[in-house]
Amino acid sequence: MIARTSLALGAVLVALSCIAARAQDASDLLLATLWTQRSVEYKANALTVFALARIRLDEALVDRSWTAAPAEQTGDYQTLPSAIILDIDETLLDNSKYQVWMMKNDKTFSTKTWNEFCAAQISTAIPGALEFVKYADSKNVKIFYITNRAAETEKDTRENMQKLGFPLGGNVDTFLMQNEKPEWGSAKSTRRAVVTKDYRVLLNIGDNFGDFDDRYRSSEADRLKAFDSDMAYWGKQWLMIANPTYGSFDTAPYGHDFKKSREEQRKAKRDVLESWGGPAK
């Protein structure tokens, strides 16, 4: 009887530990998603960035030497018409409902479910985003969207953004999707180069380091070096929207190696964090 009771108790403990582990995995997104979807602090942060964007845009329109694409903007660009480059997801569109779905169903990101989410066309505008883009459009600045949404989602993306009131570019294709052309991979410099052929880029706004610099998938140390080398552009030509839910910051601790298990990925992230030593004994 004692043996049976011990076995039963052991089975219960194992089951509870498995449930706890699943709950812990699922909660990785909880605080970040709660902040972006529900907090006034996030709304204030986004509004602040887009308010600064208006100021920087006006400065850039006056200063003909100004460019937000230093690596791609070459030649006599000063007389070119003006444009800005914006990322879409978590820069202009709030996709936190997808994050919530993943948490509630204990799922991780997959292209299939993400594309289905895009097809639902339920993303909403980030606070301040639509107002800023309309302001830029009123200044005759061409709006280019360089996004790592896949090319097959372009129709749904356009329709979602049109419903919200974002300008679509008229007779110019302003949606530059990932893999729309063979050379348009996840790194965005090749697409920025397309824009700079015909436009002077005044601002670049995104939520991930990769929206600005192709070195985003390097080690944490190399990312920091790249960030430091770009220091003159942050807050001026380059503006960052806060996104704690996902991005290259999240994958850098485990070397962007997506073959690692969820447990290995989480361990790598915990291992790089600096901790207080605790109370003195």
Where are these regions (language model features)?
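Active-site neighborhood of HAD-like aspartate-dependent phosphohydrolases
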Residues: 81-83, 92-127, 131, 138
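Second-shell loop/turn segments in exported
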Residues: 35-44, 115-123, 144-150, 179-181
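Surface-exposed patches in mature extracellular/periplasmic domains of secreted proteins
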Residues: 61-73, 143-148, 170-173
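Non-catalytic pre-domain segments flanking phosphatase-related domains
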Residues: 23-86, 258-263, 267-281
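Bacterial N-terminal signal peptides
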Residues: 8-17
